[in-house]
């Protein structure tokens, strides 16, 4: 942000919040997140360009790619996902703001306990993923474009150079992210010290996330998930660990709620 208080229109990073809503609390969660926390804990923060929500029903969660090397303790958890794009300076500005903001919301009784954190972290945008017939949508506009679905993958860096992908869905858009260290800690989200649910765990301590915005809904087929995850790992120079599809949530609609259980 400049001295005049204006913002660049650029993608510096992202806030990624994947949680598992506890059974029987889906509607209450949706009311809370969709009409309060999405804004008070996200969109209204400094340097936020945009935000978007997705969900995963049971079939999608069961069709996730999970490698033998995946260290996540519950890789099929996560039925709700929110992401926020951050402009230049946003990684520092947003997380400096959100830590006390969460404490304030908690003091006002505006948090929701019937959910478990699965992956909640901040990421720095690394590069747009190159692949055949990629979407022409600028990554800055990805959350607002109206893509039909999302596939998220995690991989562990191997040192191998990225290879342009050749077998991803036409007109999809891939963006590679690296973790932004120190974004959140257990104290920020009120979980016990060392409890899982923040950064994606890997043997080396490093994880690369790729978000692939899809022109259509993701398949609930395990072979499809495996193929996409492996292709994304090659294109990001990583060993594939985890890959998951998500359906978009329409703002103001609750049609997805019954499918979250």
Locate the predicted segments by residue.
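Macromolecular interaction modules
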Residues: 1-261
């Amino acid at each position: 942000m400049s001295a005049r208080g204006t913002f660049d229109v650029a993608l510096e990073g992202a806030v990624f919040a994947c949680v598992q809503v506890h059974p029987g609390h889906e509607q209450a969660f949706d009311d809370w997140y969709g009409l309060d926390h999405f804004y008070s804990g996200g969109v209204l923060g400094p340097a936020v360009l945009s935000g978007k929500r997705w969900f995963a029903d049971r079939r999608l969660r069961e069709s996730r790619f999970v490698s033998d090397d995946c260290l996540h303790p519950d890789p099929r958890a996560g039925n709700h996902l929110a992401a926020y794009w951050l402009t230049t300076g946003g990684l520092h500005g947003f997380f400096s703001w959100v830590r006390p903001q969460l404490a304030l919301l908690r003091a006002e009784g505006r948090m929701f306990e019937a959910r478990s954190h699965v992956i909640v972290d901040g990421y720095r945008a690394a590069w747009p993923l190159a692949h055949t017939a990629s979407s022409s949508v600028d990554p800055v506009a990805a959350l607002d474009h109206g893509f039909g679905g999302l596939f998220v993958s995690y991989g562990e860096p191997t040192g191998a150079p990225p290879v342009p992908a050749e077998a991803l869905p036409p007109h999809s858009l891939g963006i590679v992210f690296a973790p932004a260290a120190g974004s959140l800690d257990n104290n920020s989200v009120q979980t016990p010290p060392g409890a899982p649910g923040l950064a994606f765990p890997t043997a080396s301590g490093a994880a690369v996330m790729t978000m692939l915005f899809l022109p259509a809904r993701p398949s609930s087929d395990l072979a499809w998930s495996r193929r996409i995850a492996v292709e994304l790992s090659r294109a990001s120079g990583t060993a594939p660990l985890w890959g998951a599809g998500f359906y978009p949530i329409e703002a103001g609609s609750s049609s997805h709620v019954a499918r979250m259980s």
